[in-house]
């Protein structure tokens, strides 16, 4: 059970960092 909690926290942190960088700089590659 503890492993699932740590994995969930890790994924959550990575998504927060990803969205922070994604919205801070306007993506040029993602424009389709």
From Swiss-Prot:
Main function: Found at the monomer-monomer interface of the photosystem II (PS II) dimer, plays a role in assembly and dimerization of PSII. PSII is a light-driven water plastoquinone oxidoreductase, using light energy to abstract electrons from H(2)O, generating a proton gradient subsequently used for ATP formation.
Subcellular localization, as worded in the UniProt entry: Plastid, Chloroplast thylakoid membrane
Protein name according to UniProt: Photosystem II reaction center protein T
InterPro entries: PSII_PsbT, PSII_PsbT_sf
Membrane-spanning parts: 3-23
Assembly description: PSII is composed of 1 copy each of membrane proteins PsbA, PsbB, PsbC, PsbD, PsbE, PsbF, PsbH, PsbI, PsbJ, PsbK, PsbL, PsbM, PsbT, PsbY, PsbZ, Psb30/Ycf12, at least 3 peripheral proteins of the oxygen-evolving complex and a large number of cofactors. It forms dimeric complexes.
Keywords recorded for this protein, A-Z: Chloroplast, Membrane, Photosynthesis, Photosystem II, Plastid, Thylakoid, Transmembrane, Transmembrane helix
Membrane topology of this protein: Single-pass membrane protein
UniProt-listed GO biological process terms: photosynthesis
Superkingdom of origin: Eukaryota
Primary location class: plastid
SUPFAM superfamilies reported for this sequence: Photosystem II reaction center protein T, PsbT
Family: Belongs to the PsbT family.
Species of provenance: Cyanidioschyzon merolae (strain NIES-3377 / 10D)
Disulfide bonds: none
GO cellular component, one term: photosystem II reaction center
């Amino acid at each position: 059970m503890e492993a699932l909690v740590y994995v969930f926290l890790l994924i959550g942190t990575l998504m927060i960092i990803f969205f922070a960088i994604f919205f801070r700089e306007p993506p040029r590659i993602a424009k389709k």
